[in-house]
Every structure is written in structure tokens, then in C-alpha cells.
Amino acid sequence: MSSLDDLIARAKLLLSEGHSPGQIADELSLSMETVTWLLTQANGGSAAPKDVHIDWTAVSSQAPLLDGIALMLLNRYYGAQKDPAAASADVIVGIALSGIPLATVISVQEAAQLAIYHPAKQNASEHPVGSISGNFAPVAKERCIIVDDVITSGNTMREVVKYLKKHGAVPVAIWVIFDKRGIRDIDGVPVYSLFKISRID
């Protein structure tokens, strides 16, 4: 079985287990367009969308390695600041699902509060909206750093930034491990990634 066949099978398995296409996109670190294609693909169909699959489970499943990634993100961010003390945040916002463990580790290292954002794409309602979980820190009037594993299209990050600003928060930075788009900032909020992923055709 090819890696493409594996992805098609995995996407269909996740769908059969009740995952929404948005959750599948997060699980596989792929765009919604690619997931839609995987779920509707019959042999010999249309060409696959241009995307890059990232499997970082060797790190994400090991807490000590995840801690090391968090430390690299901290060093990457503070190393780029002219005044590191002024660059700190009150709240670390983890984007569900993959951003949550990373944000948790970072919030411990930063002695910051932890907030969790549920993107609209994970909401199965007819008119999906994203939201901050009421079980974690509030974001109003707080300086926030947004954390996730991958920027695929940038749509989720735009959604989070818009949500935070609308609710009176001040997003100061976006931290990701992998950036598939090479985005410098999202609506004025700078992006700090460890790795930029480029597809060369």
C-alpha cells in the first residue's frame, strides 16, 4: 500500500469512528481541501491537492520530547525579541487538539495561564463557530500567545486572532512547530515557527 493509500484509509477510518472532517484535518496535519479529497477519492479519480503530510507522533507522544520542543519554541521567540521582558504573555492559548499539550508545557515553563481554543472546523453544528473553553483561563484584557503544531492554510490562525481581538485580548505572537505556508504574520500578529515546510513541484 502506498503512503497515499495509507492516508486515504486512515482518513476514512477516522470518519467511520465519528471524527468530523475538521478533526481529521487536524489529526493528519492536512488542509480541509486535502481531507475532502481523501474522503471522496475513488481509484483513478482527480489529482490530489498539493499538500504535505507531517507525522510528528514520535515527538508528540513522548512528554520529554514535547518538553524539548516547547523549550525550542521559547528560545526561538525570546531570542528574536529586543526586549524579552516586554514580550511575555499572561495567557498561552492552545488550539485543540494538537496545540493543547504543547501549550500546557509552555504555560508551565512560562508560569502563565492556559486557555484552550476550539476551532469552528471541529464544531459539527450547522453554523460552526470557534470558542474559548470556559474550563480554562479567560482571555479578555490579557496578552496571549497562540500555540499549535502546524499552520496548514492559516485559516484557523486567522479565526483565533479575530476571536481573541473581538473578545478584548491582545494576541502578541503565534508559535508553531511547522509552517506550511511561510507566513510572517496573521493580521499583524507575528508567526514564530521552528520549521518552514515548502513543496517544490
Swiss-Prot record:
InterPro entries: GfcR-like, PRibTrfase_dom, PRTase-like
UniProt superkingdom: Archaea
Keyword Transcription regulation: yes
Keywords: DNA-binding, Transcription, Transcription regulation
CDD domains: PRTases_typeI
Biological process terms in GO annotation: pyrimidine nucleobase biosynthetic process; regulation of gene expression; UMP biosynthetic process
GO molecular function: DNA binding; orotate phosphoribosyltransferase activity
PANTHER family registered for this protein in UniProt: OROTATE PHOSPHORIBOSYLTRANSFERASE, PYRE-LIKE PROTEIN
HAMAP family membership: GfcR (MF_01214)
UniProt similarity note: Belongs to the purine/pyrimidine phosphoribosyltransferase family. GfcR subfamily.
Record's comment describing the protein's domains: Contains an N-terminal DNA-binding winged helix-turn-helix domain and a C-terminal regulatory domain (or effector binding domain) resembling phosphoribosyltransferase (PRT) domain.
UniProt name for this protein: Transcriptional regulator GfcR
